[in-house]
Amino acid sequence: MRLLVVAAALALSAGGASADKAAARRSINDKGTMRQCTDRGGKKSCRRVAVFQGHNAARSTLRTDPLDRPSGDVWVRAENLGEEFQGNIYKPDGSFDDAALAKLDDLWRDTRSGDVRAVRAELYEHLSRICDHFPGRRIDLVSGFRFHERDSSRHFHASAMDIRIKEVSIRELYSFAETLDIGSEGALGIGLYPVSQFIHVDFRAPGEPSYRWTDWSGHDGGKKSPGRTQPARKPVS
């Protein structure tokens, strides 16, 4: 049933962005549910649905073939900082360019405290794959490392990013991100935020399951719902 809920959300038309934003006006109560109405054939039907809907990704939906190595090209702008990076994360010999990674780490820094933490290089490789898939488009970073986040968050462990791309629907971005999930040693958590208009992508510790969710709460959605996602373990090298 949960799979059907998420599938239905992804099946909405490209014009669904304004409808998604209108969801912020729906009544969200303290129990983590909201009133959602549909109009079919002139008949209006309303029900209360969970603001947060999540599930482990089915193994059958995960990628079975190895991921191609990305070009390494990255173009990303941190929205809250007004700073951007455009360059390559690899050296000519194919190894990681530590100077480029350091610049990205700085872009990922906590916007409240200014703290910087080394971000998982695998996350930057996924960022490059997204850039390769949407050539010529800049990725906007909504949130990266968050020092003040609870330690169960992947943002706290510097292994997550909230992103969007101008003129690319978040559903299209979400769908492509799903193709990057190989499970097992490279599991991803991927979340869709229709009201705030971004997706979340995180790199998970070995043995953690791939996870998918849709969160209808907005920036003013109140406290987070209990059980909204699984506790994070710090990814290890």
Language model segments and positions:
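Active-site acidic/histidine clusters and adjacent loop/turn architecture
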Residues: N80-L81, F85-G136
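Second-shell loop/turn segments in exported
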Residues: G72, W108-R120, A160-K166, P209
